[in-house]
């Protein structure tokens, strides 16, 4: 996915790669979510490593320290990720939920 936020292109893979390197993160999926000001912004869905309890601000600040600030997720949600039987993350399920009632332009 490419997120277009205020005219800037943000690669979800690039953001995920940085968040995966956070010591408290086991899994992550980043998707675009609607935003009234920027059109779309990144949102990260994070599965913490067992016994770890990172805060949303920790993930956002960590990402900002490795990428341009506008690429950091505006929102972080913790919990399990929807997956296929083979273990692939089903980002479309996350997108469908977040975009319910909105229309994605790009």
What is each residue range found by the language model?
Residues 1-71, 80-82, 87, 93-96:
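AMP-binding/adenylate-forming catalytic core of the ANL superfamily
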Residues 98-106:
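Acidic/polar alpha-helix N-cap and adjacent early helical turns
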């Amino acid at each position: 996915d490419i997120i277009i936020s205020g005219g800037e292109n943000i690669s979800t893979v690039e953001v995920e790669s940085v968040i995966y390197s956070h010591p408290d993160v086991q899994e992550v999926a980043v998707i675009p979510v609607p935003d009234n000001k920027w059109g779309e912004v990144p949102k990260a869905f994070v599965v913490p490593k067992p016994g770890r309890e990172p805060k949303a601000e920790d993930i956002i600040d960590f990402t900002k320290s490795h990428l341009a600030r506008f690429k950091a997720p505006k929102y972080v949600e913790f919990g399990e990720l929807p997956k296929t039987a083979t273990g692939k993350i089903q980002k479309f399920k996350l997108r469908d939920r977040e975009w319910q009632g909105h229309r994605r332009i790009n």
